[in-house]
Amino acid sequence: MNLNATLIGQLIAFALFVAFCMKFVWPPLIKAIEERQANIANALASAEKAKQEQADSKAAADQEILKAKEEAQKIIDLATKRRNEILETVQAEAEIERQRIIEQGHAEVESERKRVQEELRQKVAALAVAGAEKIVGCSVDQAANNDIIDKLVAEL
């Protein structure tokens, strides 16, 4: 048994095996590995892109929330301003109405005072005429009575 011939035979068999593997086995394995690497790279890129999109979306959402808060504050400020304007208007109208009612009350009081004063003058005049009739002892006719009362009222 020649060790060299066996070694050469094994070397040839191994070389054929390597050539066979290089030709038929290795390319599909490399292809599968490259596909897997591409899939992993795509998945990582997609994950990174999704992460960036999520960050952008969060920033946009935060911006929208900030805008909404500002808009809500503007609406609240406008409503407060409008409320104050309405309150001022209502208070001014109430003050005008109060003044009108007070003036009307004063006018009514003055009118009532004049009416009572006139009534009192007529009663005083009637009493004066009645007293004068008792003193004189005779009654004057009604027309003369009215003339005397009118003159007394005018003097009072």
Swiss-Prot record:
GO molecular function per UniProt: proton-transporting ATP synthase activity, rotational mechanism; proton-transporting ATPase activity, rotational mechanism
Organism, as annotated: Actinobacillus pleuropneumoniae serotype 5b (strain L20)
TM segment ranges: 7-27
Protein name per the record: ATP synthase subunit b
The gene coding this protein: atpF
Keywords: ATP synthesis, Cell inner membrane, Cell membrane, CF(0), Hydrogen ion transport, Ion transport, Membrane, Transmembrane, Transmembrane helix, Transport
Membrane-protein topology: Single-pass membrane protein
Location in or out of the cell: Cell inner membrane
Gene3D superfamilies: F1F0 ATP synthase subunit B, membrane domain (1.20.5.620)
